[in-house]
Amino acid sequence: MTRKQRRATFIAVSLGILALAVGLVLYAMRDSIVYFYSPSDVVERGVEPGQRIRLGGLVEEGSLEQLGDAYIRFNVTDFAETIPVTYRGVLPDLFREGQGVVTEGALDGTGAFIADNVLAKHDEYYMPPEVADALKRTGNWQGEGAEAPHSETYGQGSYP
């Protein structure tokens, strides 16, 4: 082999190994690239109990319960499926029924979600794109002009 042929062979083999490595990394990360799963996604994909995921959707109206010892129970819904969530801790200030939420944790054996972290959306009008897409898929999207929950009091009151 000439020097030029060895260099070309080395480059071709190196590019092949690099492409294989990138492919393996992307394959391994295929499930962790998703920011969160909607309740419908959890049911459709058959998420295993104990598998850590992020569950996102809307906090179902009337589902918030204060349990003893700082435990809180509420339902997360995308209007097609609903998953009960149990959380122990202090909820974010922006957390309330009818608003978007992302929870981190795992399903237990009964299909309930045990959260160890709860993230609330930024303001009354923000909705994560994934939640909006899930609402559109289920036919519950009310459009850009729809009034946000509790919007009659938004902007009223005194601020420091």
From Swiss-Prot:
It holds the Pfam family CcmE. Heme binds at residues 122, 126. It comes from the Bacteria. Residues 29-160 are periplasmic. GO terms for biological process: cytochrome complex assembly. The chain crosses the membrane at residues 8-28. Disulfide bonds: none annotated. Residues 1-7 are cytoplasmic. It is found in: Cell inner membrane. Residues 141-160 are annotated as: Disordered. HAMAP family: CcmE. This is Cytochrome c-type biogenesis protein CcmE. It comes from Parvibaculum lavamentivorans (strain DS-1 / DSM 13023 / NCIMB 13966).
